[in-house]
């Protein structure tokens, strides 16, 4: 059974693979905007041949119009992505049938070797293929988990801006492939029927990708070990949200990996006032990028000071979107037990940090309290109630 831990491992392997493969140079045509549009346009003649009925023709025409409008909208972004080194020699055929779990390790196999044009692509096109495949199979939660862990590993949140284009493209490729199979003379009637239904399902999925979502901005608030990351981890799957973690971005700003040990005395090292300011500024910038791409964003940080929260409330107001403050807590004895017992991870907090936070945190203002949802992570029913409140 495919589980979240499997997709997290595949995200790590694929992210690391993308980091080390060759990058398309400026003198290569691969990844140029016109090369991005070309394979997308090639889907439509075949789709019209596979689905000649009037109703399908109208849907295909609308999807082609969206593709062309999207290309015009993101043309400069496609060029920027290549300039910034995100067009690389990728796997090229990254879907579930080319992934395996062997001896408790992830294995990615059968890369696309015969056509370099389909292999030298934006890494986000490759990510979009697997995200689409998971969603098409009814695994939206696992798709969100994979996407989040890939982004957390690479920091490529800017790539979300072009992800909708690639999701539509990948869904239409699958629609075309199944449509062609349904027309093959040597296929039996059962296979033709199954492929025909799959073709229509992928077409419907592509249409859903073209519909703008209603993103919202969610920030966590709580001291170390209160369970912020555990809560946000659950919300990733249920909301299809993108999470940004202060523990990870703080270290990224310093050129460190998430697993690096950056422990220091309270308000020292990466956690001094300058480091804290830079981290929250980074979180605000990334949240804006994620929202602009049409995704709900969860900002996983302590947010113990009003001055840290206010810019995020202002961002939500500016964008005209829903804003939520998750007040995440647990009894102090539980907090201390968690600090002592938890394994090393992205967080560097110890008991001294917890003591400082408990003494210095600022309560929500009256203006902020209307956005508050409370979660006691020591109570089993609390998370379920939160899910209901956010639906």
Spans of features found by a protein language model:
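Hydrophobic positions on the alpha1 helix immediately C-terminal to the Walker A/P-loop
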Residues: 231
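Conserved substrate/cofactor phosphate-moiety recognition/catalytic segment
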Residues: 234-295, 337
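Small-molecule kinase domains that catalyze NTP-dependent phosphoryl transfer to phosphate-bearing small molecules
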Residues: 341-387
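ATP-dependent phospho-/nucleotidyl transfer catalytic cores
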Residues: 1-96, 100-216
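Conserved phosphate-donor/acceptor-positioning beta-strand/loop module used by diverse small-molecule
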Residues: 319-339
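Conserved lysine of the Walker
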Residues: 228
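Hydrophobic anchor at the beta1->P-loop junction of P-loop NTPases
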Residues: 218-220
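The conserved Walker
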Residues: 223-224
């Amino acid at each position: 059974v495919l589980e979240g831990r499997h997709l997290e491992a595949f995200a790590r392997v694929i992210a690391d693979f993308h980091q080390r493969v060759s990058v398309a140079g400026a003198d290569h045509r691969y990844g140029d905007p016109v090369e991005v549009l070309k394979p997308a346009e090639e889907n439509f003649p075949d789709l019209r041949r596979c689905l000649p009925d009037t109703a399908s023709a109208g849907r295909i025409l609308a999807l082609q119009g969206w593709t062309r409008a999207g290309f015009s909208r993101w043309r400069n972004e496609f060029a920027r992505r290549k300039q910034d080194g995100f067009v690389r020699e990728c796997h090229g055929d990254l879907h579930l049938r080319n992934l395996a779990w062997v001896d408790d390790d992830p294995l990615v196999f059968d890369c696309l070797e015969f056509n370099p044009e389909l292999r030298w692509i934006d890494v986000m096109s490759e990510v979009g293929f697997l995200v689409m495949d998971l969603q098409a199979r009814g695994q939206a939660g696992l798709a969100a988990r994979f996407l989040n862990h890939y982004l957390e590993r690479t920091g490529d949140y800017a790539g979300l801006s072009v992800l909708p284009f690639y999701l539509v493209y990948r869904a239409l490729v699958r629609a075309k492939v199944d449509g062609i199979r349904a027309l093959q003379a040597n296929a039996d009637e059962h296979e033709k029927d199954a492929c025909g239904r799959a073709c229509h399902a992928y077409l419907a999925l592509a249409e859903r990708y073209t519909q703008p979502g209603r993103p919202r901005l969610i920030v966590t608030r709580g001291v170390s070990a209160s369970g912020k990351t555990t809560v946000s981890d659950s919300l990733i799957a249920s909301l299809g949200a993108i999470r940004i973690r202060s523990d990870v971005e703080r270290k990224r700003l310093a050129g460190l990996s998430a697993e690096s040990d950056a422990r220091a005395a309270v308000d020292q090292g990466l956690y001094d006032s300058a480091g804290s300011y830079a981290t929250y500024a980074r979180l605000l910038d990334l949240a804006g990028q994620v929202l602009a791409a049409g995704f709900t964003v969860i900002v996983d940080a302590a947010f113990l000071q009003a001055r840290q929260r206010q810019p995020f409330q202002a961002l939500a107001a500016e964008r005209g979107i829903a804003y939520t403050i998750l007040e995440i807590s647990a009894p102090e004895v539980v907090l201390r037990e968690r600090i002592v017992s938890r394994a090393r991870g992205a967080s560097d907090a110890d008991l001294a940090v917890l003591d400082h936070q408990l003494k210095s945190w600022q309560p929500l203002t009256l203006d902020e309290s209307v956005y508050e949802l409370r979660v006691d992570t020591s109570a089993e029913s609390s998370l379920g109630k939160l899910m209901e409140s956010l639906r």
